Amino acid sequence: MLLLALSDAHIPDRATDLPVKFKKLLSVPDKISQVALLGNSTKSYDFLKFVNQISNNITIVRGEFDNGHLPSTKKDKASDNSRPMEEIPMNSIIRQGALKIGCCSGYTVVPKNDPLSLLALARQLDVDILLWGGTHNVEAYTLEGKFFVNPGSCTGAFNTDWPIVFDVEDSDEAVTSEVDKPTKENQSEDDDAKGGSTGKEQPGSYTPKEGTAGERENENESNVKPENQFKEDEVDMSDSDINGSNSPSFCLLDIQGNTCTLYIYLYVNGEVKVDKVVYEKE
């Protein structure tokens, strides 16, 4: 059984469509048994129509930017034209073979994307595999016998809470060391205050330096630092790092008995790359 996991399409707010190569890969009829939409993927009718063509067995969970309700696929008996509204659940469970698969968007997990919080949710749902979205980044790891999979954003939409890491501890240590370290000026002032009659210069006194005016001018020029020394180092950042966008990705789970083979599809530089991870229930 093949289970397709899609998340965070954000169509039409942040993206227009799936990559063309993704659509060609997923357009094979009668190949994928079920589709899981893990949030932020219900605002585009064309996208939902395409997903329904992949498989009419679709599990949808509510994302942070989804509406609370979605038109039902079943027509209302009282009226042939209207369709009742169905509430989109926060969590859902899929049972395939010997495995139970939990689905959630992940924005209700606090702290967000925290492995221990996700483990607590997996235990609460009593599932072997937990699929979650909301971060726009692909992740797959095993924790205490449970398998955690995040398919990323299928369109590569930008993430508003894209993390930026600063080395705060290192900078604090550097500042502390500079503050604690006595400067030469402070040492000289202390020596002058203690010197008294030792023949050292007193505050406010001035003793002209020996040498010609030309020598003194050359010495002053040598002490001037070049302008290039004050320029900051240029940081090499890609466009995706600047605008917070991500590489489009999705996951395909091949479930056979108590074994799950995960295929991770990444769209990088116009090419589709595939990684494989195998999980077996203990």
Swiss-Prot record:
UniProt keyword terms in alphabetical order: Protein transport, Transport
GO cellular component: cytosol; endomembrane system; endosome; retromer complex; retromer, cargo-selective complex
Biased composition annotated in UniProt, kind: Basic and acidic residues: 178-187, 212-232
Top-rank taxon, per record: Eukaryota
Record Pfam families: Metallophos_2 (PF12850)
Annotated stretches, region: Disordered: 173-242
InterPro entries membership: Calcineurin-like_PHP_lpxH (IPR024654), Metallo-depent_PP-like (IPR029052), Phosphodiesterase_MJ0936/Vps29 (IPR000979)
GO biological process: endocytic recycling; intracellular protein transport; retrograde transport, endosome to Golgi
Summary of subunit composition and partner proteins: Component of the retromer complex which consists of VPS29, VPS26, VPS35, VPS5 and VPS17. Component of a retromer subcomplex consisting of VPS29, VPS26 and VPS35.
Function: Plays a role in vesicular protein sorting. Required for the endosome-to-Golgi retrieval of the vacuolar protein sorting receptor VPS10. Component of the membrane-associated retromer complex which is essential in endosome-to-Golgi retrograde transport. The VPS29-VPS26-VPS35 subcomplex may be involved in cargo selection.
PANTHER family linked: VACUOLAR SORTING PROTEIN VPS29
Protein family (similarity comment): Belongs to the VPS29 family.
Other comments on record: Present with 259 molecules/cell in log phase SD medium.
Entry protein name: Vacuolar protein sorting-associated protein 29
Organism whose genome encodes this protein: Saccharomyces cerevisiae (strain ATCC 204508 / S288c)
GN (gene name): VPS29
